Amino acid sequence: TFDAKNYTAGPTDVLPVTMLDFSDSDAGKTWVGDIKQGATCNLTINGNNLPDDWYYDNDWFQKEEDGTYTFKAITGRYTVQADFTHKSFRIWTMNGNEPMALNADGTGAIWIIGNEGINKPTWNAVNHGWWTGTDSDVCLTPIKDKVYQVTLTIGKQLRATDVNFKFFGQADWGIEFKGKDH
């Protein structure tokens, strides 16, 4: 827009900001909704900016200089769940109201299920092995159609002395990725 009286111009489009506010209550720990790839997100705890000691997953979000976060995954429906004990978030893709599974054409979701030597934000945050479900498994970030990303660091998300995991097509037993010798 242009103001002819004051010779000032304004933005032609105002980009929406996705507000993800969490509180330490049963109802306040989980956000479910649609997010567009590249969307600007405000991650807040009780209405305040995300504290520096909270872990945000670089596979899902990129922190910007202004304190907002850019959503890196493809456009879709997601669950973002705050873990106040470990000051972090668990994030997974959704199909309606259910966790997303891998589709026959390669779209959907890929999950990691493993022993207590792997998890996010740290390998010992969810310290029980081979359990299934969104509280235990790691959903890979879909960054493009049929392209998934996960970043794991030895000593943080991977225990250096004992790591054992597999890729699955759902947050449960079922579709399992296997090598040629299996």
Predicted regions located by residue number:
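Insoluble glucan recognition modules
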Residues: 1-182
